[in-house]
Amino acid sequence: MKALVICLLVIFAAVIAVPVESRRKHLDYGVITKCAGPNPPPGCYPPGAQQKNPTPANEYRRGCSKITRCKRD
């Protein structure tokens, strides 16, 4: 009797699980792009900011400065 009930439960679970898996046939846009989600990872920019040129962290100057006291050619 127990084996029959267990077999029926397994069959019933398999019949119910098939339609649940076949409902979604496409991916959501939020799954594809991580930056579109509510909590974007570091490195994501707000919409429209990717076209702008990034600002440099520090300005590069070639050669020596007064403070380093290095020889000049």
UniProtKB/Swiss-Prot annotation:
InterPro entries: RALF (IPR008801)
Tissue: Expressed in flowers.
Signal peptide as annotated in the record: 1-17
Keyword presence, Disulfide bond: yes
GO MF term list: hormone activity
Keyword Metal-binding attributed: no
GO biological process: calcium-mediated signaling; cell-cell signaling; regulation of growth
One GO location term (cellular component): apoplast
Job description of the protein: Cell signaling peptide that may regulate plant stress, growth, and development. Mediates a rapid alkalinization of extracellular space by mediating a transient increase in the cytoplasmic Ca(2+) concentration leading to a calcium-dependent signaling events through a cell surface receptor and a concomitant activation of some intracellular mitogen-activated protein kinases.
Name of protein: Protein RALF-like 10
Disulfide bonds: C35-C44, C64-C70
Pfam families assigned: RALF (PF05498)
Family statement drawn from the similarity comment of this UniProt entry: Belongs to the plant rapid alkalinization factor (RALF) family.
Localization of this protein: Secreted
Keywords: Disulfide bond, Hormone, Secreted, Signal
The encoding gene: RALFL10
